[in-house]
Amino acid sequence: MMGAAFAKRDPRIAIIGTGGRGTSLLGNLLVAKAQVVALCDIVAEKAQGAGAMVVKAGQKQPDLFTNGPHDFERMLKLSDIDLVIVATPWLWHAPMAIFAMKEGKDVAVEVPGVTTIQECWDIVETSEHTGKHCMILENCCYGYNETLILRMIHAGLFGELLYGEGAYLHDLREELFSNAGEGLWRRTEHTRRDGNLYPSHGLGPVANYMGIQRGDTFSHLVSMSTPQRGLDIYRKAHLKAGDPRNAEKYITGDMNTSLIKTSKGLTITVKHTVSTPHPYDRINQIAGTKGIFYDYPARIYLDGQNKDESFEGIDKWKDHEHPLWKTEGEIAKQNGGHGGMDYIMLYRLLQCVREGLPPDMDVYDTAAWSSIAPLSEMSVSRGSAPVQFPDFTRGQWSSRPISAIATQA
């Protein structure tokens, strides 16, 4: 599957998971005039509501599969489905993606793509054996700032890259203790794992900036976590006596910091916190020999461009705006989805399939970006010892071409 393109077609899409995230993706797909032919969820009412969205968009009623947690298998045996969107709790991502590929379907899977190193290898080997794609739906790679900075990097404005930093800093305490949506399953992850549980929102754009697995590769990481305090404090303040959640023991440190070294010597910091008071922030920093960019708020400093030692905004660099944002930006903003990046991501996925192009992020990226979570857990458990990255490309990272998202419309 190295460098392979999608089979050119107008895809017939099935979505597994029609909760909050699945229906958000569905809405954007319908605006992009995607064919949605089947929907699956363990809650029949959610699948029915998603089906009504499809009909309202002028398409025929999609087939619904709501007969338990394994009914997706029955759905994926249908011959008229050729692209599957997986938007379910994390532990289901790998088995659903693998089953879909074995049934001859390309897959686009929500983040984190998979959760263990074995699953990373499983999706790579299944993709190679079946000839089907497994793309990570990392929407943050399609943000306006991220795509603009990526094109500036490829124009040489940052010089040789040296350092990047990404993060997922998001106060999810209320959501984690909700009796609906992600509160039904995501909090459980905090009882099982201590590391960076959700790395790719911050890491994905930085990996694209640096050409990771396309001329460079992750070598090793060290990771450390603070004590866990936030969920205990929130629970004490908000739950009543007798609530069964009071018996849960949380082990995920409130802030995890992981430091990655690449084979070329570049360094990357990746941070994660969802259990403390914090404004939303992905940091999105990249530094090179000619300048530096930080996000939240967006600010840039390029050698010879600033009159004093101070940052400036990025408006003057609008000529590097990505072609997708030039042509689809207004539609993207009107349809929401994290500032429009969700729409751009799905529009681009459809574009790649319809034009027979390779995916911007392939199964090797899905595996490498997802591997941060289990590797960070290993390092934390070993006293922050260095942990080596597997080479999911089996040595081919040095000759793979740069992802087309950097240049293509």
Describe the residue ranges of each PLM region.
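Active-site beta-strand termini and strand-to-loop segments that position acidic
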Residues: 258-264, 288
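Beta-strand-loop-alpha-helix segment that lines the small-molecule cofactor/substrate pocket
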Residues: 83, 89-90, 94-142, 156
